[in-house]
Amino acid sequence: MPTAMLPSSPLNRQQGFTLLELLISSLIFAIMAIMAYGGLDNVLSNSKASQQALNRLQQIQQSITIISRDFSQLVPRSVRDEYGNIQPALSTANDVDNLVEFTRGGRANPANLLRSTLVRVAYQFDDEKLVRLQWPQLDNAPGAEAKKTTLIDNLESVSIRFLDDNAQWQEEWPPVNTGASISNTISPPPLAIEVVLNLTDWGEIRRLYAMD
């Protein structure tokens, strides 16, 4: 008796994947992997950019704090240079490399050492950087070197000007038209000092410090 042929079931016909299905699955997986990698790369890039922006903000804030502390504690104490010559308490002409040089108070002394609370500082604009200088003592001995600290980089320009007792802004101090040259007892300290920083990324930062 002939054996009847049973039709194959749909289950038997669908065991496994065709080559086309495998190719499509691989393509979808590759696209998803690329999208996932791109998303991760964007996250990492954004995180790095955010950290750089935060570091820059902290640098600017710390620098402004130091500048403000220096100028707000300016004192009328003239000094002697390494040659014994008297220099003004505040001057823009002591050194061609310095924007300004002055005496300030408030030097910390947590160990109660036998030293003055006054210190001599200066600011330089060098290679797109604002550099702060501080000398170990007020009256410099021959060969005395200042400690240099870079405060801000990526600077386009720095300008400092001084408000005299006639309410006129001066680019130099002591003002050249007063004839004063050696001490702030002859040329009184300015009424105010303006500092303008032009940053390549943040633009202009302007600070005005009133002198007591």
Predicted regions and their residues:
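Intrinsically disordered, low-complexity regions enriched in Pro/Ser/Thr/Gly and acidic residues
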Residues: 103-188
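Edge beta-strands of extracellular beta-sandwich domains
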Residues: 206-210
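Short acidic/polar inter-strand loop motif in beta-rich domains
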Residues: 202-204
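Short, Lys/Arg-enriched, disordered terminal segments
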Residues: 1-14, 53, 212
